[in-house]
Amino acid sequence: MTQASAKFIVVEGLEGAGKSSAIALIRDFIEKHTGHAPVCTREPGGTPLAERIRDLVKIADPSDPLCDESECLLIYAARAQLVANVIKPALAQGNWVLGDRHNLSSLAYQGGGRGLMPLVEAVSNATLKGFKPDLTLYLDLDPKLGLQRAAKRGELDRIEQQAIDFFERARATYLKLASEDECIVVIDASQTMAEVHKDILAVLQAMAW
């Protein structure tokens, strides 16, 4: 791998799937093989404006509940800012980018979970214009197990408090989209952390960059 062949890699998964530890592993792998740390992003978030939008999406306001359509549009507003002001400039400068979630999350959560796929696809096409990661690692986990893990971290946010069937629909959408796109690799996140990390490293080492 070289800095000149900079790529955009994303880690996806339901709550409690182990994204944080996977991202740390991939970050170290990229730095070791390129000599440079990747630009790390999270969604929603990653720019000052996008972080403010993140708070609107994540924190419930009983006095003004966020409707599903507003949630979708806010997330895409944050993503548009991040892509325009961070991700594309970083790639243009030869820097690898490592993302904690990207467009696949919206397709799964808002498209599958909320049942808003036509809106999600329309806004995705309008804002991203075909821009997508070079590789997405989807950490697949039963939603019940994932939420149990997430609950151990502390208080659940507005998204994490959704009913289990929301996450089941999101998972089904993740798996369907992964089956249709060779750039999305499914990792069994029900394994031990060591096994998950072994599988991730195998994918990274096998890719012809």
From Swiss-Prot:
Any Gene Ontology biological process: dTDP biosynthetic process
SUPFAM superfamilies membership: P-loop containing nucleoside triphosphate hydrolases
Origin organism lineage: Bacteria, Pseudomonadati, Pseudomonadota, Gammaproteobacteria, Alteromonadales
One example GO MF annotation: ATP binding
Alphabetized UniProt keyword annotations: ATP-binding, Kinase, Nucleotide biosynthesis, Nucleotide-binding, Transferase
Pfam families: Thymidylate_kin
Species of provenance: Shewanella oneidensis (strain ATCC 700550 / JCM 31522 / CIP 106686 / LMG 19005 / NCIMB 14063 / MR-1)
UniProt binding sites for ATP: G13, L14, E15, G16, A17, G18, K19, S20
Keyword Transferase included in the entry's annotation: yes
CDD domains xref list: TMPK
EC number assigned by the record: 2.7.4.9
Gene3D superfamilies: P-loop containing nucleotide triphosphate hydrolases
Keyword Kinase in annotation: yes
Signal peptide coordinates: none
Catalysed transformations (reactions): dTMP + ATP = dTDP + ADP
Function: Phosphorylation of dTMP to form dTDP in both de novo and salvage pathways of dTTP synthesis.
Name of this protein: Thymidylate kinase
UniProt similarity note: Belongs to the thymidylate kinase family.
